[in-house]
């Protein structure tokens, strides 16, 4: 387990090298599917995408059709309310050709979604988790204050945060 990492408190253990699928929106369907499958054959099991990454989910869905249970897929929603959360989740499930998403993340929200905050986002995520549509709830953010709040809340199983030596935070 030398090059393995456990994702937050999910219990998911994968190779520390994951596949960030934002760039595959810039290449053809055929090339993207080939690249994702090649990464899988090379031992990559964690694939990260988002609704905002145009057709990235569709390309991963095709790439892993038939081997879905052998990979971990994370995707994200930028929804600001429960109604849009459900729309995004159903679209992601259809695009990814799956009945569940391993890690569903709030994508860089301006605030930390919490129960009772009026947005309904966290409640929707919990309901989706109870229904088996998502397995784990995470948050991605570029704001240190929101990231700290997410950690301190204890509500999130993962936090995806960019680190940079040249950042002021």
Task: Give the label of every model feature segment.
Residues 1-71:
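N-terminal binding-site loop/beta-alpha segment at the start of enzyme catalytic domains
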Residues 6, 14-18, 45-46, 70-74, ...:
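Structural preference for beta-strand elements that scaffold enzyme active sites
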Residues 18-30, 74-84, 110-112:
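Active-site mouth loops of central-metabolism enzymes
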Residues 22, 50-52, 76-80, 106-109, ...:
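Active-site beta-loop-alpha junctions enriched in small/polar residues
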Residues 56-65, 85-97, 114-122, 143-155:
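Distinct, well-ordered alpha-helical segments
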Residues 58-76, 123-132:
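Alpha-helix-loop-beta-strand connector modules within alpha/beta enzyme cores
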Residues 86-105, 127-131:
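CE4/NodB-like, metal-dependent polysaccharide N-deacetylase domain
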Residues 109-169:
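Beta/alpha (TIM)-barrel catalytic core signal, keyed to glycine-rich beta->alpha loops juxtaposed to Asp/Glu
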């Amino acid at each position: 387990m030398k090059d393995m990492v456990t994702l937050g408190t999910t219990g998911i253990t994968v190779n520390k090298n994951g596949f960030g699928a934002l760039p595959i929106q810039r290449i053809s369907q055929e090339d993207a599917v080939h690249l994702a499958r090649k990464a899988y054959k090379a031992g990559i099991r964690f694939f990260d995408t988002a609704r905002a990454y145009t057709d990235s989910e569709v390309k991963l869905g095709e790439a892993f059709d038939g081997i879905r249970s052998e990979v971990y897929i994370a995707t994200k929603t930028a929804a600001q309310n429960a109604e849009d959360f459900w729309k995004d989740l159903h679209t992601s499930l259809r695009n990814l050709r799956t009945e569940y998403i391993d890690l569903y993340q709030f994508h860089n929200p301006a605030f930390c979604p919490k129960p009772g905050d009026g947005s309904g986002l966290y409640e929707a995520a919990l309901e989706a988790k109870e229904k088996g549509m998502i397995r784990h709830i995470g948050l991605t953010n570029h704001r240190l204050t929101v990231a700290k709040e997410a950690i301190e809340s204890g509500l999130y199983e993962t936090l995806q945060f960019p680190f940079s030596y040249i950042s002021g935070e």
